[in-house]
Amino acid sequence: MDCTAAVDIEVDNVLPTRRSLRVAVVTETYPPEVNGVAATIARAVQGLRERGHELQLVRPRQDKHEAATQDERFAEVLLRGLPIPRYPQLKMGLPSKRALLRHWSSHRPDVVHLVTEGPLGWSALQAATQLKLPVVSDFRTNFHAYSQHYGMAWLRNPIMSYLRKFHNRTLCTMVPTAGLRGELMSTGFKSLRVVSRGVDTAMFDPARRSPALRQQWGVGPQDMVVLCVGRLAVEKNLGVLVQAFQGMQAVDPRVKLVLVGDGPERSALQQRCPSAVFAGLRRGEDLGAHYASADLFLFPSVTETFGNVVPEAMASGLAVVAFDYAAAHQVVRHGDSGLLVPFADSAAFCAAAQRLAGQTAWVRAMGEQARMKACQMDWGRIVEQIETVYVTAMSHHTVTTHHALRPALPLL
């Protein structure tokens, strides 16, 4: 399908700008690490570079032998990091205020973009504030919501207080959906701007469907493959996935479940679903082939700020079953490209999945519509929105640097 004709998607009303900028992007995760934040910020960085901007990428060193990439308009600044508990393949950046003060004093950016709120992000905020640099941020992960899934619900309010303090010290916080903006505004977050997410419709394409891969999974051409992609962790609500799949099996025993991803819940899931395929971490074209070789995408998570896997599945030609919030609310049309159910209603989720068992023709028809919708999610327009947030923040910062308190940006 031709995906060249993009149409408007949900973003604030902003105008693109073509001024070349020096941008420092600070993130505690980046490819080859596999997660939604790493994937989307890497795509944004690529888009900004393609549009002629000069980028500094500030991140933790992923291993002790890693060398920073440097060229004329792109420079990595690699700092100290530690493995994250239970996720040793991921790094948490350590406080690096002094190093950033030194670097930004001699390589001063026009604007600092904080992607994550960890120790590195906080020290970058402090350094940028001390140097009187304009700072914008992203709200990308519902850490406050994760706490209840790890038996630490008492941490929810302190975490939210920290996140609010962090983001309210920046000139603008970008959020991926209007729903999240409303939720955060109601708890005291300020200057929020909707900048959605795009999807790579060349990487995620039904043309990557692989009969050989389906044969490896032990399914025939007409058998339904149900896919879930993401971290195998308790906050992803995977118990509901198992229930939904078992309900589908009761209707059609040939249904196959494939899980792409890894995490601490893998062993428990393998015990509960011995017939499922656990494909582990997949990247690039291999990941695209796994998406395209399935038929239906089940997404039971209730802790997403967006959920990049939803448009990736849709771009791959899969119908989606999801809770009606975040990316699914924004891009899935109920009954046309998938089925949406009320937020956190596990029984409704399982019933929707079971309803599609054996309905191969309907699922395929919704998958075709899903592909058409995904083709409207153009990354070029998203990068334009980010550019304009930068320029607006820079202009406002220049006018108001004498104020001690953070001013609110005018509506874009």
Residue ranges of each PLM-predicted region?
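N-terminal subdomain of nucleotide-sugar transferases
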Residues: 1-80, 380, 409-412
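Aromatic "clamp/platform" in nucleotide-sugar-dependent glycosyltransferases that forms part
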Residues: 302
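Nucleotide-activated donor-binding/catalytic signature segment of Leloir-type glycosyltransferases, i.e.
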Residues: 266-285
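Conserved acidic donor-binding segment of nucleotide-sugar-dependent glycosyltransferases
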Residues: 334-335, 339-346, 355-360
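Donor nucleotide-sugar binding/catalytic pocket of nucleotide-sugar-dependent glycosyltransferases
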Residues: 59, 77-80, 156, 160-209, ...
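Conserved donor-binding/catalytic core segment of Leloir-type glycosyltransferases
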Residues: 220-246
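Short hydrophobic beta-strand element within catalytic cores of glycosyltransferases
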Residues: 319-322, 332
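Short alpha-helical donor nucleotide-sugar binding micro-motif in glycosyltransferases
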Residues: 104, 281-282, 289-294, 386
